Every structure is written in C-alpha cells, then in structure tokens.
Amino acid sequence: MAQISLTFPDGKAREFPAGITPAEVAASISTSLGKKAISASVDGRHYDLQWPIETDAKIAIHTMADEAQALELIRHDLAHIMARAVQELWPDVKVTIGPVVANGWYYDFDREETFTPEDLGAIEKRMKEIINAREAVKTELWERARAIAYYEERGEPFKVELVQAIPEDQSIRMYWHGGWQDLCRGPHLQHTGQVPADAFKLMSVAGAYWRGDSANKQLQRIYGVAFKTRDELKAYLHMLEEAAKRDHRKLGREMELFHLQEEAPGMVFWHPNGWQIYRTLEDYMRGRLRQAGYKEIRTPQVVDRKLWEASGHWEAYKENMFIVEVEEEHAKEKRINALKPMNCPCHVQVYNQGLKSYRDLPLRLAEFGSCHRYESSGSMHGLMRVRGFVQDDAHIFCTEDQIESECAAFIELLSSVYKDLGFDSFEIKLSTRPEVRIGSDEAWDKVETALENAIRKVGAAYEIDPGEGAFYGPKLDFKLTDAIGRKWQCGTFQVDPNLPTRLGAEYIGEDGAKHRPYMLHRAILGSFERFIGILIENYAGKLPFWLAPRQVVVASIVSDADPYVAEVVAALRARGVRAEADTRNEKINYKVREHSVGKVPVILAIGMQEVEARSVSVRRLGETRTESMGLDQVVDQLAADARIPG
C-alpha cells in the first residue's frame, strides 16, 4: 500500500498508509486523543474525521478545546438535528438549506402552517432526545443520479434542485444519523451526543425566499443559537436582553433623534437632536483628520457610468447601484449615471488633476462622502443597515516605501479616536493574499510585511485571516468591542495598486520616470449612520457630555425663578454649552423624569433659594443625589466638559 507523509503542528512528520482517516491518525497518537478528537485541519481545510487523506499533507487534530472548530461543528450538527426533528414531528415538511451563521444557525422549511412558539418548544424537546440517543454520524460520496433519484423518491424538490446545481466534476456528499439523511459538504461531529444538549436554544421564525429570490416560494426560517456550555448560552441570552434595552431604534424615538419611513426606505430622517449628534461627530472627525495631515475634498454624488466602467465597479457592483437615466438635450441616447456607492474612483479624479511628484506623496484626501447602495428590504435595520449613508472616507496616495509608516500612523489615529469615543479595546485582522490575485508574490510579500511591521510598531495585537484579502491587495479590519461585549467591524485599511492603474494615476519619481502610486483606502467609523447607532447602544443613550445633543436643561421650580433660568441658559450658551430652559408650569419631579427619559446628561433645578444665592442645584443623569454649585463654577465646569476632544 502506498504511504503518505503527514506533518504535525510541531513540525514532526510521520508515515501513514494512503487513505488513512484523521480519526485513525488521532487514535494512533493516543487513545485519549482518539476519544477527544472532533475534526482535523488538513492543509488548512477543515476536515471530517471520517474523510480519507490520500496525499502528503500538514495535519492538526481538533478537540472541543479548539473554540472556532468546535462551535462550527456544534452549530452545523444542530442545523441537521433540527431539520430531522422537524420532519419527524411533521413528515410533510420539505427541507432546503441550513448554514452556520454568527452565534448559531438557521434552516429553511417549506410548510403550509406557520411555526408557532409552541412548535419551537416541541422541536427543541425532540432535538434533545436525538442528541441524548448518541447516534453515529455517517457519511458517503454518491453518484449524482443516485442522489437525484433518492430525493425525487422522497418528494424533496429543493434538494433535487441543489444536487442539479452542483458542478458535474464535484462529488456529492451525504450525511446521516439514525434514519435521517441530508446533502452536505461537512464536516460534522462523530455522533449526536457530542453536541451539548443544554447549550442551544431556538430563537425565532422568519420568512425567507428560496435562494433569496422574491420570485421564488416563500419559506419559513427557524433561527437557533448554540455555544459550548450552558453558562455561555445564558450569558448570550442576557446580552440579548441588554441589547433589547439599548436598541437604538427604541432610544432614537425616546430621544427624538431620527426616524425612517416607507416613502424613503433605508434613508434617514434626522431630527434636530440626532442631527446635532451627527454634526458634533463630524466636527470631531474633521479636527482629527486635519491634525493628521489630511486634506478634505468634496466629490459629486451622481457620476456617469463611464467612470464606473473604467474603475471596474459597473461590472462588479451594478446590481447594488441606484441608476439615474437622463435625457440630455440634443443627445442621441439617454445618459446613464449612478449615485456613487463608494468614493474611491472620484478621489482618483481629484488626484489626477495636475502633475504629481514623489515630493507630493503621501497625499491624504478625505471626504465625508455621501453614498447610496441598494440593500434588500429584509436586510435593512435602523441605522445599522441603510441605503443612503455617509462614510468617513479617505484615500492615501503613496509610494510602496511609505505604506508601512502610513499604516502605523493610521492605526494610532484610529486607536485614539476609538478611545475618545469610549471604546478602549479593538481587534485587528490581517487578510492576506487569495489564491486568485494580481501582482507578483514578491509584491505581495512586501505589502503584507509592511502591514505586519506597522501593527508591531504600534504594539497592537492581531490575527491573520489567510486568503481573505482582495484580489489586488491585503487589508486590515478593525473590530471594536462595546459595553455588552458585542464586536463591531468599523475600521478598514486596504492596500490597492489596482485602481490607480485602471484610472491612470501617476507621479514622477525621483528618477524622473512615471510611476503608479499605491492607493490606501481607509475608514475609522465606517459610516456615520451605523457608528451613531453603535454609540447609542454602547452608551444606552447616555452619550458623553460633549456628544449629547441636549447637554443641559435648566428647569424652574417656581415661575418667579424664570428670569434667572434665562440668565443661566444664556451664560451656558455663551460658553458653547447646548442648554435650554424648561419653565413649563409642571412639577420639578415631572420635568426631571421627562428629561431623564430623553437622556439629558445634566439638569439644573432652580428655585428661589438658588435665585437668591446665584447658584444652581445640579442633578446628573443616572444619579439621585443633587449638588449645589455657584453659577460661575458650574458654567466653567460644563463648558470644559462640552469641549470636543482633540
């Protein structure tokens, strides 16, 4: 029998018979590893323990201690277990697909009756029975005709369609436990008992179209979440409760920040309070960019398709563009324009105006660019996913030798901005060269090394996401962590030698010859709309004083105090504090409750005692005690608190 060489993570290699499975490899190392093993990585591919290995390879055996692999398998197996439970409870239900998603999985079903909360409880109960039965998971490769015949015989039209869509040169893998079988690429655990029975929960039912196409049949999608332990599940469910309390859509109504309506789907109607947050954040970012050497520009929102064709976006992104057709005077045909979905091609046009020298580089062009992208109605979510948004976008034109220093400076800027906004921790992911790419390996080596050196230079931790870079260059993604532990990908840094080439960007080098600059795409917030949504939820509406739309309400206790209330408001406004008066004929406790719901950080209560002493009674949001302060003292303190950082 032919032999193959398998190399382990410690660099040691061993000879094995060709066709050996990872399960057999694990057992050959130790009996305990054979029992603990759940899957393997073979040449970087997540591999089922039952799959044979036919050639030399690098191998790593995974156990439940390997978080990423364990969760993927648990959630994937639960998708199959749930589908089986549904069909055992309601045999007429047709199954479709059930992928792993963030924190869990979903499965789409074709059923005439709507799934109810009681149905979800019954499904969960049956799932736990399947898990506790500890049935072996088996897999086989089938011929296409056999798979089609199998599903046609069982009346599963969606599975027939899936099999028919698989390229003829690809094998068709089947998995089953008990008597229930499903089409699946795998991998899976080795028996149902490896799934924690107390660490999952079915969450909700939603409508979904087959293959995401509204022209197709509408299905029912059941979502579930799963973790390795019961405590992790409880922590996640608690986080969801907290997230519901912090929902920016609910707080947006209470604080009178914004609204959305069906006449302009995915477009934000900013109210005065919300627009104040937006403008303050924009002023802050403008100041930080100015300090960092960026030059602010403004480019058109409606741009002819010719530019999008030249940049390559028309071919790759047309379906997500808003197209505007115009009948130009004396023109033979309509002019086709698009609302810009991104700013980068327009920034190259600004760069291309006038001859550039190496002495002009790096050139940092920033824009608070208004963009529009078509998002399906089902994917939109408050401020978090919209069709019209503004990016804190910038592009750095530089030489290859300047990439490292520009990247390091950007990471330091991003870190400082996040801290100012209340986010002390973030993660960096470096996405490296994909299999299909342009450029030489030498060029990729240089830019990937430049990014890694930049990260190390600023002392940041990072992880590598192999093969997930764009076809033209590597990128960094920055994920911040909010107050309840959720991670949000906001910042990006993308190296791009491609767009300058497509759009003819050049500079005269020190050698007197023409060269192509590198273009570095970068953003810190991502979009203002989404980031404001994140801020609202992170702070549960209790924004930092400098960012709060209504910073101070000066409330009268008696009407005789109204003139002094007006004086206090005027003194605060003169020092840049956003202050307003509340002299309504209402009790002070009513006013305090109302403004607390509106998340006003500071309420100054004024009665005749304060008038006579020229003082104020200070109540801060979330506190029950009050503090008496002199007028000059409180104005100085609040004016200092109101200053925009940086």
Swiss-Prot record:
Gene Ontology biological process terms from the UniProt entry: threonyl-tRNA aminoacylation
Catalytic activity: tRNA(Thr) + L-threonine + ATP = L-threonyl-tRNA(Thr) + AMP + diphosphate + H(+)
Enzyme class: ligase
Location within or outside the cell: Cytoplasm
One cellular component (GO) term of this entry: cytoplasm
Note on cofactor: Binds 1 zinc ion per subunit.
Described purpose of this protein according to its UniProt entry: Catalyzes the attachment of threonine to tRNA(Thr) in a two-step reaction: L-threonine is first activated by ATP to form Thr-AMP and then transferred to the acceptor end of tRNA(Thr). Also edits incorrectly charged L-seryl-tRNA(Thr).
PANTHER family referenced in this protein's UniProt entry, alphabetically: THREONINE--TRNA LIGASE, CHLOROPLASTIC_MITOCHONDRIAL 2, THREONINE-TRNA LIGASE
Subunit structure: Homodimer.
Protein name: Threonine--tRNA ligase
Species of the source: Cereibacter sphaeroides (strain ATCC 17023 / DSM 158 / JCM 6121 / CCUG 31486 / LMG 2827 / NBRC 12203 / NCIMB 8253 / ATH 2.4.1.)
